[in-house]
Regions:
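Short, small-residue-biased leader/transition segments that mark boundaries at the very start
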Residues: 1-2
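Alpha-helical substrate-recognition element adjacent to the catalytic core
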Residues: 6-82
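C-terminal cap/substrate-recognition subdomain and adjoining C-terminal extension
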Residues: 44, 56-147
Length: 147
């Protein structure tokens, strides 16, 4: 349903990969797989990161090599230009996935479940009674898609 489609801003360091800035850390388990599924479901993904210049290009290329493509990078839409926006730099996203979230970053299985079921973090945790480390949700989803 198109009414359920969201614009999702995703941080890079500490969210998609472990914090090793300015280097690129190891992928956080299931990050790229989850992002690819969200893109296949037609959500608009925006890479929202402090990286700039060459460091930003390295992050974009790292994602591309793993099949993750973003609708835009550090802006609301691809054609947006800093010099012509005349308004706040704040993104107009429906959801932000960032390791600096209040309460920290849930695992990517929980993130997918929260988006898919449109539930906030607390009810998901209460339903599952496992706050972190349970990746069975995403593993089941990947298994279904690979059959």
């Amino acid at each position: 349903r198109s009414s359920d489609l969201m614009t999702i801003a995703v941080d890079f360091d500490g969210t998609i990969v472990e914090h090793r800035y300015p280097k690129i850390g190891e992928e956080i388990p299931f990050a790229t797989e989850t992002l690819k599924i969200l893109a296949q479901e037609r959500h608009k993904l925006i890479l929202w990161t402090v990286r700039e210049g060459e460091l930003l290009e390295e992050a974009i290329e790292w994602c591309r090599q793993r099949g993750v493509f973003f609708y835009s990078v550090n802006k609301d839409y691809p054609e947006e230009e800093k010099s012509h926006n005349g308004f706040s730099r704040k993104l107009k996203a429906d959801l932000f996935i960032d390791d600096r979230n209040l309460g920290g970053l849930p695992d990517w299985g929980t993130i997918y479940q929260m988006i898919h079921e449109q539930k906030p973090y607390e009810p998901v945790l209460c339903d599952r009674q496992k706050p972190t480390g349970d990746l069975s949700w995403i593993e089941k989803l990947l298994g279904k898609r690979n059959k």
